[in-house]
Amino acid sequence: MMKRIVLALFCAACITNMNASTLVAYFSATGTTKAAAKQLAAQHNARLWEIEPAQPYTAADLDWRNDKSRSSLEMKDPEERPTIKQCTDVTHYDTIYVGFPIWWGICPRIINSWIDNNLPQLENKTLIPFATSGSSGIEEAEAYLKKTYPTLKWKNGLLLNKR
């Protein structure tokens, strides 16, 4: 009988630990956000997942000064959803950090693709945006995510720039 009680308590502890698991999902165009995501995952003992575009971005795609570059065209169209290479199963996570570089003051459209692909599984999760940027804050990106996905439980975001 005592063995069963100990086993039940052990299983309950394992289930509680699984329910409290954390995922760090991120998109990184140049490696800056990837480095921040790795540090964040290590700090929180979290699983790391890279949100990758089906078609990788080239340097020309990322030229924000060129109105015809891929990133410029994507950001001009609020309905644009770049195709993701592969999705991850988010059902086992309670807390998910969502990371990205700031593009045009907000998250890149590939983040919308990832969120859209994972709805409604994200609806009972705690989502914490984090971003990297050379000059912008995260406030506009936070407001955009909360407005675009009002049914999701967003916490205040983190700006993780190298200083």
Task: Tell where the protein language model's regions lie, with residue ranges.
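N-terminal secretory signal peptides that target proteins for export/translocation
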Residues: 1-2
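N-terminal beta1-alpha1-beta2 submodule of the flavodoxin-like/Rossmannoid cofactor-binding fold
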Residues: 18-98, 105-107, 116
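A mature extracytoplasmic/lumenal domain signature
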Residues: 28-29, 102, 131-134
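Generic recognition of short, well-ordered alpha-helical segments
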Residues: 35, 109-113, 139-143
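Short, surface-exposed basic-aromatic patches at helix termini and helix-loop junctions that form
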Residues: 116-121, 146-150
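A short helix->loop->beta-strand "cap" motif at the edges of active sites that frequently abuts
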Residues: 122-126
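Short, glycine-/small-residue-rich phosphate/pyrophosphate-handling segment
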Residues: 128-161
